[in-house]
Regions:
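Beta-propeller domain segments
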Residues: 1-155
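Ser/Thr- (and often Asn-) enriched beta-sheet segments in non-cytosolic proteins
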Residues: 23, 158-160, 190
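Generic preference for flexible, low-structure residues
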Residues: 67, 93-95, 149, 159, ...
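Conserved blade-ending motifs and adjacent loop-strand segments that build the rim/top face
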Residues: 123, 152-173
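Blade-level signature of beta-propeller repeat domains, shared across WD40, Kelch, NHL, RCC1
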Residues: 168-194
Length: 194
């Protein structure tokens, strides 16, 4: 039930809505971040010690988040209280309990790097060069290339049409491999210019 699930998201002893670091030797885990609605892609940037995360919002409000590691407290990205999206019509959800604040920061949450309204249905995210990244999109049937500046803000955001749902992406040796859903095929793009 929606209300039970969303209540679990806010509890620190629940794993709902959390990004976890799992010890593969003993299955112990540590909560890296919380307040996530529907994570789709994760990329650990070892060089810069952060995680990029793509996330589906409700009706709109898809996000790319930057999760700083080794913080003193667990960062909260706001769900189910903050989102650039809107509620779906539902008799189960009590909207007054879940207002979907448009500003995350004003309510004590971490702002996304970017929110997409209307929804683009982001998929995987990966790094393709020194500080260039790319995220796939299922609804928008495209790729989003972007850089992060010294303040870790998105710059040079560029949309490249693919005309198919991009389910997953992998970067290897100046090539971006796209796992395309509409035709169950693999697309390859030379990204050596980045």
């Amino acid at each position: 039930m929606i209300i039970v699930r969303d209540t679990l998201l806010k509890k620190k002893n629940s794993i709902n809505g959390k990004i976890l670091k799992i010890n593969i030797n003993n299955s112990d885990y540590e909560i890296i971040s919380m307040g996530h609605r529907n994570p789709q892609g994760l990329f650990f940037d070892k060089e810069n010690n952060f995680i990029l995360e793509t996330e589906h919002g409700p009706k709109g409000g898809d996000e790319i988040n930057l999760i700083e590691l080794n913080q003193n407290k667990i960062p909260n990205y706001g769900w189910p209280l903050a989102s650039a999206g809107e509620h779906y019509r539902s008799t189960e959800l009590k909207y007054k309990n879940y207002p979907l604040y448009k500003s995350h920061k004003e309510h004590g949450f971490i702002e996304p790097l970017i929110s997409f309204v209307p929804s683009i249905a982001p998929s995987e995210v990966t790094k393709i060069s020194n500080n260039y990244y790319v995220a796939g999109s299922m609804r928008n049937k495209s790729l989003r290339f972007f850089q992060l500046d010294n303040d870790k803000k998105i710059i040079n955001l560029t949309r490249v049409e693919v005309f198919e749902r991009v389910r997953d992406i992998i970067y290897r040796e100046n090539k971006l491999y796209m796992f395309l859903e509409d035709t169950a095929s693999i697309g390859v793009i030379d990204v050596s210019q980045f």
